[in-house]
Amino acid sequence: MPAIVIVGAQWGDEGKGKATDLLGGRVDYVVKPNGGNNAGHTVVVGGEKYELKLLPAGILSPNAVPIIGNGCVVNLEALFQEIDGLQARGADTSKLRVSANAHLVAPYHQVLDKVTERFLGKRAIGTTGRGIGPAYMDKVARLGIRVQDVFDESILRQKVEGSLHQKNEVLVKIYNRRSVVVDEIVEYFLSFAERLRPLVIDSTLVLNTALDEGKVVLMEGGQATFLDVDHGTYPFVTSSNPTAGGASVGSGIGPTRISRSIGIIKAYTTRVGAGPFPTELFDEMGVYLQKTGGEFGVNTGRPRRCGWYDAVLARHASRVNGFTDYFVTKLDVLTGIEQIPVCVAYDVDGVRHDEMPMTQTEFHHAKPIFEYFDGWTEDITGARTLADLPENARNYVLALEKLSGTRFSAIGVGPDRDQTIVVNDLIND
């Protein structure tokens, strides 16, 4: 059975957790292929809200095996805190597994993340301060510590010493901080070994064997397309590749085994942190979307920047990820707005751009060119088919589908799992 990948099509917080949760009851494995506890997502099940950070949303699907993939960076302390929090609420976390090849976030990564952001001042990226970027830097620099290293104290010590040799110089001489003691870091990691050991697997082997046996594997991408270190609005991006190609690398599932690439996209647009955002609203409408949509970060509580739907971004995201389907979320948030603008192109220094500008400078100068659609006042949270939607809401959805260039197979009309219009089956269609 081929694999399915879910990818955020904007700047994150699109509702990937809801999409994963909706499909979770029909899949056998849910793997998180990238990111760490910097990418929070909210899942509502039976009126209960769960805010997940490091764990895949599939942890709440009783039939699925949730896996933290090799492309992730894992803060072990945060991992077990999140597990304990779910268990305290009666959730079953016993099926959770972690790739032996996933990298670890060390306490010094978090220190470096925070002091670097402060040092940069106005040039700061706006990270969550959780050490994700520094952990990925170590991975690429071949100084990283992996999950499997926790079970070999000799290897662990060698790697910690190698990593701290340079970092202590930076902390002491540049940031005026105290040096980090090797023994403290080694003991920190070893303290998790006993509890971690039964969770660790060869995830590449497990997932590909599952596919060989006809099982359904869902890859749940973190962050989003325009936070991708290669395809995003660089340098205001994350440190990994949260696109469909990155899901393949971060799970060990080859690209030819992926049958569906599903983009998750809001009916409007949000962004957290610094970086360009052509359709951003700076008036009371932006505040309205923020409050009505509950647009506050799961991890940081920071208010999200809000703006109108951007079809240029949607087309580019579809191209980069090879989307077969879009899952649109939060259509209900737009209820009550008299006229809804949609960005269909950009004006860059007097020149119309129907597609994403090539350069960073051009994108910073991009101004949205809008088309306007009549809104609706009717409550749509009970709609379960397109025909149930008011005419104006239906027209809005169909217009977005045409402008975005990829079929809309599901539409979220509320936060709960069942508040979804399914147009096309996302697994078998």
Curated annotation (Swiss-Prot):
IMP binds at D13, E14, G15, K16, N38, A39, G40, H41, T128, R142, Q223, T238, R302. It is found in: Cytoplasm. Disulfide bonds: none annotated. GTP binds at residues 12-18, 40-42, 304, 330-332, 412-414. The active site is at D13 (proton acceptor), H41 (proton donor). Substrate binds at V298, N299, T300, G301, R302, P303, R304. Keywords: Cytoplasm, GTP-binding, Ligase, Magnesium, Metal-binding, Nucleotide-binding, Purine biosynthesis. Pathway: Purine metabolism; AMP biosynthesis via de novo pathway; AMP from IMP: step 1/2. It catalyses: IMP + L-aspartate + GTP = N(6)-(1,2-dicarboxyethyl)-AMP + GDP + phosphate + 2 H(+). InterPro entries: Adenylosuccin_syn_GTP-bd, Adenylosuccin_syn_Lys_AS, Adenylosuccinate_synth_dom1, Adenylosuccinate_synth_dom2, Adenylosuccinate_synth_dom3, Adenylosuccinate_synthetase, P-loop_NTPase. GO terms for biological process: 'de novo' AMP biosynthetic process; IMP metabolic process. Its EC number is 6.3.4.4. Belongs to the adenylosuccinate synthetase family. Homodimer. This is Adenylosuccinate synthetase. It comes from Pseudarthrobacter chlorophenolicus (strain ATCC 700700 / DSM 12829 / CIP 107037 / JCM 12360 / KCTC 9906 / NCIMB 13794 / A6). The lineage of its organism: Bacteria, Bacillati, Actinomycetota, Actinomycetes, Micrococcales.
